[in-house]
Amino acid sequence: MSSQIKPIKIYGQGGPNALKVALIFHELEIPYEIVVVPYADIKKAEYTAINPNGRVPAIHDPNTGITLWESGAIIEYLVDRYDSSHKLSFPLGSAEFYHSKQWLYFQTSGQGPYFGQVTWFKQLHHEQLPSAIERYVKEVNRVTAVLEEYLAKQKLASGSDEAWLVGNKISFADLSFLPWYTIMDFFLPSDQYNVKNYPHVKQWQDNMDSRKPVQDAKKVFKLGE
């Protein structure tokens, strides 16, 4: 990535969605700087002027003047703007172009909300609600089963251990799922969720975790501590 690119500001360093964006920064070697937003301040006027929804992350790109929030929208912007070689993306109009968006939207509408809710009801809610926990634990396993079945088909088709969601390479679609899976073991006991029950998902995660850009991003945007 050109050294002439000014660092993109990312607001927020904690949580899976900030890491989700950071993975793209590191994979594409996009310079960035972190603006720490304390949890107590995310609903204050200074930050809601940037993100009216009062959530992290958000970004401001001084190279284009664009400010964005919602991690999925940020990822689409970053690959559209900074991945002209299609390292993590696919040519406009190709089947893979649309399939990668399909999986990203499944992550943002399926995995993220359900995994977030199980985390809330397991760790943060003021009282234990077994029925709520049971529902979201089931959804965590259902979403993972969808990925397990699809990755098994991809592995069979590719004939290698590196099965990816789209085509024969890692893409932003794969990376978008990794942060929530990174912390599930911290929040759910093995009798509720165990990645070893999903061998293709585990291999997929291991393949992503073995990448240096992923390791570097996780050192900065730490989860589960």
Residue spans of the language-model regions?
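GST-like fold's C-terminal all-alpha helical module
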Residues: 103-206
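Active-site-flanking alpha-helical
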Residues: 79, 180-181, 207, 218
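C-terminal helix/juxtamembrane-tail motif
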Residues: 213-225
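Phosphate-coordinating loops and pocket residues in cytosolic domains that bind phosphorylated ligands
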Residues: 49, 210, 219
